[in-house]
């Protein structure tokens, strides 16, 4: 993404935010550390918009960690409200799905950086995020592996993939996955009692009130509270739809033009 497109995206966000003061921007890939000079300039530009428009930007960085260094960590710890560190769990699981360009795994390269990053953030305002697939249905082992590495904020989520892909989750996998969630819950309770507790994103639910009415109506907020911006400035309901022409909403210069598509996400 160019600086010009990024600035226009922030201008679009401010112009369409109404009376909402807190605005969220996630630098998401691709890999934003490959274009980090633009990330830094966009953060500075966003800060310059806060006072005149009575806004507060909450920036998030999502990274695979390969290019992560001390300078990026220092900037992120100063400017990013949250960081998301991509790792799939055990070494063999992560390296199978996340090889580097030379075909080698990324686990040994990123784990020391991620552990340092988490400690620099005092084990808050971050999470390590993995994806489980048909190849690692025993995903609770990956969650516990990340906890054993010292991470306190963990999210491991099911892959979203076309059904023909060999790594896609299948209907026959569901009983095993449900067992894994039960297994994980029991182990988390045990560790909490032992003083070794950690947070698992999908278990962080308000058991007394549950989802609020607005959330039940709008779901994840795609197309209404959330938009994805491509490097060329095109707008989509979320990153899952990027590249699908039938879901293109418009662009950051002309705004949302396909209102009929956006309205589908309000139902």
Q: Which residues make up each language-model segment?
A:
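Radical SAM enzyme [4Fe-4S]-AdoMet core and its adjacent flexible, acidic
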Residues: 92, 96-108, 115, 119-226, ...
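Catalytic cores of large soluble enzymes that bind and process phosphate-bearing ligands
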Residues: 1, 34, 176
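Radical SAM/AdoMet-radical enzyme domain recognition
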Residues: 3-28, 35-159
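Short, acidic, Ser/Thr-enriched surface-loop or helix-capping motifs
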Residues: 230
